[in-house]
Amino acid sequence: MSGENIVVWGTTKTLEANGASISNNALAQADDASYDIVNDGSSYPDAEFVLTGAFGTGPTEGTTLALYARPLDVDGTADTEAPETTRATVFIGTFTVNNVTSTQNIVLNGLFAVGVPKKADYYIHNNGTGQSLSAGWTLKVTPRTNKAAP
């Protein structure tokens, strides 16, 4: 049927392909790439984020890793301040962890983020899992939006 609401996805982009270990209560940038909804996301305002990683010792069940954005080029080429563990910037969502040491593929709680910043760097905050996220973690983003079916 034409005209009904459908979900469409863009091309997945890797923001971090091999992240360094993130200690409990520490913050790390996914610094392989920033994400720009115009250039990378087909101007789709929403995005799905997937974090893949493991812990050397099982984290506390149900605790979270937070995802923050640092908006870029907010005034010409001026960027906002980078987030800190005691001062977050733009909260995007959380990844709830399982109490296992095997690799976890974790989808952002709520499945996707609505209205991500136009251009941003992204950070993972290990805010209370009780363990370090092991080196080698990845963060990927897939743009998405709703539109009318043809």
Region spans (language model):
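Short coil-to-beta strand junction motifs in C2/discoidin
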Residues: 60-67
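Acidic Ser/Thr/Pro-rich low-complexity disordered segments
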Residues: 73-91
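Exposed aromatic-hydrophobic patches
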Residues: 102-112
